[in-house]
From Swiss-Prot:
Designated gene of the protein: IFI6
Transmembrane segments: 4-24, 41-61, 75-95, 99-119
Species assigned in the record: Pan troglodytes (Chimpanzee)
Pfam families from the UniProt entry: Ifi-6-16
Keyword presence, Nuclease: no
Recorded family membership: Belongs to the IFI6/IFI27 family.
Full protein name: Interferon alpha-inducible protein 6
Gene Ontology biological-process annotations: apoptotic process; cellular response to virus; defense response to virus; innate immune response; intrinsic apoptotic signaling pathway; negative regulation of apoptotic process; negative regulation of extrinsic apoptotic signaling pathway in absence of ligand; negative regulation of mitochondrial depolarization
Task of the protein: Interferon-stimulated protein that plays an important role in innate immune response against a wide variety of viruses. Inhibits flavivirus replication by preventing the formation of virus-induced endoplasmic reticulum membrane invaginations, which are double-membrane vesicles that flaviviruses use for their replication. Plays a role in apoptosis, negatively regulating the intrinsinc apoptotic signaling pathway and TNFSF10-induced apoptosis. However, it has also been shown to have a pro-apoptotic activity. Modulates innate immune response mediated by RIGI by preventing its activation.
Length: 130
C-alpha cells in the first residue's frame, strides 16, 4: 500500500512539472526551454533513483552485512566511537544497513527519485531567480 502511495505521489510530481505557466506570470512567446521541464525532471529522477539503488552496496551496506574496509565500515566505527562503543539502533548507520541488507531497492529507488526531483526543482528555481 505504501509503495502505491509513493508511486502515485511521484506521478503527481511529474504531472505537476508539466503544468504550464504559473498564475500571475506572463507567458513568453518564445522560450529558451523547448518544453515544460518534464524530460529534465525525468532525467534527474532516473539518475537519483539509480544512484540510490547502486549507492548503498557501493558504500558497503550489503545484504551480507557491512563490507570490510569500506565507507560503511568507517561510518560504523565512527558511530560506535561517538556513542560509547555501540552503534545506536535507529541511527544513520543502522538505517542504511537495514536498507542495504533488506534489498528494498524499490523504496530506495523511490527515495532517490524524489531526491532527484527535489534537486531539479531547486536548480530550476535558481535559474528563474537569475
Amino acid at each position: 500500500m505504501r509503495q502505491k502511495a509513493v508511486s502515485l505521489f511521484l506521478c503527481y510530481l511529474l504531472l505537476f512539472t508539466c503544468s504550464g505557466v504559473e498564475a500571475g506570470k506572463k507567458k513568453c512567446s518564445e522560450s529558451s526551454d523547448s518544453g515544460s521541464g518534464f524530460w529534465k525532471a525525468l532525467t534527474f529522477m532516473a539518475v537519483g533513483g539509480g544512484l540510490a539503488v547502486a549507492g548503498l552496496p557501493a558504500l558497503g551496506f550489503t545484504g551480507a552485512g557491512i563490507a570490510a574496509n569500506s565507507v560503511a565500515a568507517s561510518l560504523m566505527s565512527w558511530s560506535a566511537i561517538l556513542n560509547g562503543g555501540g552503534v545506536p539502533a535507529g541511527g544513520l548507520v543502522a538505517t542504511l544497513q537495514s536498507l542495504g541488507a533488506g534489498g528494498s531497492s524499490v523504496i530506495t529507488g523511490n527515495i532517490g527519485a524524489l531526491m532527484g526531483y527535489a534537486t531539479h526543482k531547486y536548480l530550476d528555481s535558481e535559474e528563474d531567480e537569475e
